[in-house]
């Protein structure tokens, strides 16, 4: 009887491990049934350009107990209170919460917002998450949807910066401006007024991984504008994400910078999958692209601002080990840079694109129950 029980446990664990055995992020932590007692282990698991993001590791735990939101004088127990503290904090949630913010939530540096163990929804018709000139932020396990525009008004930016007037915002789910060392992992994002993720204004050292992007037209913008050349320093890794169903374009759309797009799974798009302007370097590796049935929309790529084919001929857009389905195709250009772009701490193994559907099958928010591995 005991041997049968042990066998059942082993089969169960093997079934879990098989879901992420080749995903280097998930294999770092998801097999731990005691994840709740070792939450900060997560900070050791990022890969790519955002692998140095420590979030609130080494700091205290802060527990969100209330969905209330006061943009100017947040109460202890609310998400805004924890997010705006100056010290390192690992923010967790005591219960399931639906949070409708009254103004964008400015997240101070050295913060992890960790939704594991609760069902956390942010948005719900209000504005959403904002980072400006901060470092070391991790967002994990959040449902972010229904993000709306905000009006101008006063907001507590952080304890140090105090309350300041801010302009109206466009309704992005996650906005990053001039940030470094940020990791966005295992979130589910959809249905917002503008984009789901914006990384702009010389942000760099960002990894966007294991997220599920769906039911949204303009998904991800990397780079502020065609005249903002400071984004040449931008380095972003986009890996192990599920795009779709019903994701239209900008997965991502880049300006300047170096973008590594690896082992993502793309459902059919409505316009294009990967695009850009202003000579970004885009290295597409090990992705699975399934084109829409529309014969005019089979191309994965879209180049913007090319007055003639020669204008963009030197842009480095390369496809390696990608898998193409239903007539999808990638138009490469520029010299072959290879993918030796990382230092030892950032590098990770990229599988062939045929493996991307399996690697991304658990993208988005996971179910995390005490004493069981997250699934």
Curated annotation (Swiss-Prot):
The active site is at residue 250. Its cofactor is Ca(2+). It comes from the Eukaryota. Disulfide bonds join 28-45, 128-147, 306-312. Keywords: Allergen, Calcium, Disulfide bond, Glycoprotein, Lyase, Metal-binding, Signal. Binds 1 Ca(2+) ion. Its EC number is 4.2.2.2. InterPro entries: AmbAllergen (IPR018082), Pec_lyase (IPR002022), Pectin_lyas_fold (IPR012334), Pectin_lyase_fold/virulence (IPR011050), PEL (IPR045032). Glycans are attached at residues 110, 148, 178, 293, 352. Pathway: Glycan metabolism; pectin degradation; 2-dehydro-3-deoxy-D-gluconate from pectin: step 2/5. Has pectate lyase activity. Belongs to the polysaccharide lyase 1 family. Amb a subfamily. This is Pectate lyase 1. The lineage of its organism: Eukaryota, Viridiplantae, Streptophyta, Embryophyta, Tracheophyta.
């Amino acid at each position: 009887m005991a041997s049968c029980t042990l066998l059942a446990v082993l089969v169960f664990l093997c079934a879990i491990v098989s879901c992420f055995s080749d995903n280097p992020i998930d294999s770092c932590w998801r097999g731990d049934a005691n994840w709740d007692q070792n939450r900060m282990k997560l900070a050791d698991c990022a890969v790519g350009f955002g692998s140095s993001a420590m979030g609130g590791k080494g700091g205290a735990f802060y527990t969100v107990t209330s969905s209330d939101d006061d943009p100017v004088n947040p109460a202890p127990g609310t998400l805004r209170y924890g997010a705006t503290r100056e010290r390192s904090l690992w923010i967790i949630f005591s219960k399931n919460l639906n949070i409708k913010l009254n103004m964008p939530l400015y997240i101070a540096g050295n913060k992890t917002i960790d939704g594991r163990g609760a069902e956390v929804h942010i948005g719900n018709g209000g504005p959403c998450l904002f980072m400006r000139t901060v470092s070391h932020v991790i967002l994990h396990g959040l449902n972010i949807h229904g993000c709306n525009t905000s009006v101008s008004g006063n907001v507590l930016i952080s304890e140090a910066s105090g309350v300041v007037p801010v302009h109206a915002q466009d309704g992005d789910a996650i906005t990053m401006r001039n940030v470094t060392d940020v990791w966005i992992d295992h979130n589910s994002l959809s249905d917002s007024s503008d984009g789901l993720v914006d990384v702009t204004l010389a942000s760099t050292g960002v990894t966007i991984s294991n997220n599920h992007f769906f039911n949204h037209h303009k998904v991800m913008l990397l780079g502020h504008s065609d005249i903002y050349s400071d984004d040449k320093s931008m380095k972003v890794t986009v890996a192990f994400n599920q795009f779709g169903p019903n994701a239209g374009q900008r997965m991502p759309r880049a300006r300047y910078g170096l973008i590594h797009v690896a082992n993502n799974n793309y459902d059919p798009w409505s316009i294009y999958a990967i695009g850009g302007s202003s000579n970004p370097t885009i290295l597409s590796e090990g992705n699975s692209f399934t084109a829409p049935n529309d014969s005019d929309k089979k191309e994965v790529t879209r180049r913007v601002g090319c007055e003639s084919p020669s204008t963009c001929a030197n842009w480095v857009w390369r496809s390696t080990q990608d898998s193409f389905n239903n007539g999808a195709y990638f138009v490469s250009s520029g010299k072959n840079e290879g993918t030796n772009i990382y230092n030892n701490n950032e590098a990770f193994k990229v599988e062939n694109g045929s493996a991307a559907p399996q690697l991304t099958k658990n993208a988005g928010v996971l179910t995390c129950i005490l004493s069981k591995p997250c699934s």
